[in-house]
């Protein structure tokens, strides 16, 4: 006797669908494509996820949508407010996992730091996220859902609402370019006029240097770029950012320059992020070496004092060493800022995000990249093999 499953098919989550994908969804329902614009505005501008409240959509279509689709953001399970106004959200993403999202106010500017993965496989030595191991990529709905939940928290939805989130940075948990498609779709929703409408100069992707993905990035988006550098030479960067052993500094900076060369003149400059660690990379010779390294590249430099966390023996840079390092770069002609530590009393400062990572089946201390894939200039999939032989893939869907 054969028992047939009576389980209903899974509903399509519209939260993370781009305009093109949402139009294709309505095509599949035999509906007009303009419905995609209506639904995007309801979800991302009005904060409405209940189809019954989407009043400019006919009742029969609302009923149909309720049967086959949903609009669901991941759930905020905890929230902490810092004495300096920083707000950290703990967001559940399933499987007992959670990621952290941080809002940082600064005058009339409010920056949201968004996560792209549950944990991270890159294991940068100064970052708490890497110590948690790696579980999986976030879906586009889980990435843009962080923005949606933060906007809801600040009552940003609706006509005439004050915009509190003025900038978004992909600098939370995970390496964005190892979750290429979902990150690109999410960033494009952030900048879409029918969604959050952020200027392209107000959305920034930060990468430790997955060069094959960075080489493809300009085909899919033109957001701003930040390079998580942290060292002026390969020997030191190999220790701090292990992916440098596969994509050394020269290869990374060449790829980054190709990307910014494709941007409009007004945005043709990248940010170099440099975490200063006491007695590790904070000496005057490091500053001089960094100035020489970047001399032919349009950059601004953001110095980040190391923020201590459990499991790390590194120490915060001294104020004297920080000021000396900054002055050397300024004297060399670089715009050089210091990132003010915000939210450290709630473990929300840069490098402190850890979330909750369960089932670390893809945890890695180091990984290997298939050289044959790197040599294939037109490869669509570049497999990344972790030491435990679990696989992660960078996939480009054109």
Curated annotation (Swiss-Prot):
<dbReference type="GO" id="GO:0019843">
    <property type="term" value="F:rRNA binding"/>
</dbReference>
<dbReference type="GO" id="GO:0005737">
    <property type="term" value="C:cytoplasm"/>
</dbReference>
<dbReference type="InterPro" id="IPR040072">
    <property type="entry name" value="Methyltransferase_A"/>
</dbReference>
<feature type="disulfide bond" description="(transient)">
    <location>
        <begin position="113"/>
        <end position="350"/>
    </location>
</feature>
<dbReference type="GO" id="GO:0070040">
    <property type="term" value="F:rRNA (adenine(2503)-C2-)-methyltransferase activity"/>
</dbReference>
<dbReference type="GO" id="GO:0051539">
    <property type="term" value="F:4 iron, 4 sulfur cluster binding"/>
</dbReference>
<protein>
    <recommendedName>
        <fullName>Dual-specificity RNA methyltransferase RlmN</fullName>
        <ecNumber>2.1.1.192</ecNumber>
    </recommendedName>
</protein>
<keyword id="KW-1015">Disulfide bond</keyword>
<dbReference type="GO" id="GO:0000049">
    <property type="term" value="F:tRNA binding"/>
</dbReference>
<keyword id="KW-0963">Cytoplasm</keyword>
<dbReference type="InterPro" id="IPR027492">
    <property type="entry name" value="RNA_MTrfase_RlmN"/>
</dbReference>
<feature type="binding site">
    <location>
        <position position="120"/>
    </location>
    <ligand>
        <name>[4Fe-4S] cluster</name>
    </ligand>
</feature>
<dbReference type="InterPro" id="IPR004383">
    <property type="entry name" value="rRNA_lsu_MTrfase_RlmN/Cfr"/>
</dbReference>
<keyword id="KW-0949">S-adenosyl-L-methionine</keyword>
<feature type="binding site">
    <location>
        <position position="127"/>
    </location>
    <ligand>
        <name>[4Fe-4S] cluster</name>
    </ligand>
</feature>
<feature type="binding site">
    <location>
        <begin position="228"/>
        <end position="230"/>
    </location>
    <ligand>
        <name>S-adenosyl-L-methionine</name>
    </ligand>
</feature>
<feature type="binding site">
    <location>
        <begin position="174"/>
        <end position="175"/>
    </location>
    <ligand>
        <name>S-adenosyl-L-methionine</name>
    </ligand>
</feature>
<keyword id="KW-0479">Metal-binding</keyword>
<feature type="domain" description="Radical SAM core">
    <location>
        <begin position="106"/>
        <end position="345"/>
    </location>
</feature>
<dbReference type="GO" id="GO:0002935">
    <property type="term" value="F:tRNA (adenine(37)-C2)-methyltransferase activity"/>
</dbReference>
<dbReference type="GO" id="GO:0030488">
    <property type="term" value="P:tRNA methylation"/>
</dbReference>
<dbReference type="Pfam" id="PF21016">
    <property type="entry name" value="RlmN_N"/>
</dbReference>
<keyword id="KW-0819">tRNA processing</keyword>
<feature type="active site" description="Proton acceptor">
    <location>
        <position position="100"/>
    </location>
</feature>
<keyword id="KW-0004">4Fe-4S</keyword>
<dbReference type="Pfam" id="PF04055">
    <property type="entry name" value="Radical_SAM"/>
</dbReference>
<keyword id="KW-0698">rRNA processing</keyword>
<keyword id="KW-0808">Transferase</keyword>
<dbReference type="InterPro" id="IPR007197">
    <property type="entry name" value="rSAM"/>
</dbReference>
<comment type="function">
    <text>Specifically methylates position 2 of adenine 2503 in 23S rRNA and position 2 of adenine 37 in tRNAs. m2A2503 modification seems to play a crucial role in the proofreading step occurring at the peptidyl transferase center and thus would serve to optimize ribosomal fidelity.</text>
</comment>
<keyword id="KW-0489">Methyltransferase</keyword>
<comment type="similarity">
    <text>Belongs to the radical SAM superfamily. RlmN family.</text>
</comment>
<keyword id="KW-0408">Iron</keyword>
<keyword id="KW-0411">Iron-sulfur</keyword>
<feature type="binding site">
    <location>
        <position position="206"/>
    </location>
    <ligand>
        <name>S-adenosyl-L-methionine</name>
    </ligand>
</feature>
<dbReference type="InterPro" id="IPR013785">
    <property type="entry name" value="Aldolase_TIM"/>
</dbReference>
<feature type="binding site">
    <location>
        <position position="307"/>
    </location>
    <ligand>
        <name>S-adenosyl-L-methionine</name>
    </ligand>
</feature>
<dbReference type="InterPro" id="IPR048641">
    <property type="entry name" value="RlmN_N"/>
</dbReference>
<feature type="active site" description="S-methylcysteine intermediate">
    <location>
        <position position="350"/>
    </location>
</feature>
<dbReference type="GO" id="GO:0046872">
    <property type="term" value="F:metal ion binding"/>
</dbReference>
<dbReference type="GO" id="GO:0070475">
    <property type="term" value="P:rRNA base methylation"/>
</dbReference>
<feature type="binding site">
    <location>
        <position position="124"/>
    </location>
    <ligand>
        <name>[4Fe-4S] cluster</name>
    </ligand>
</feature>
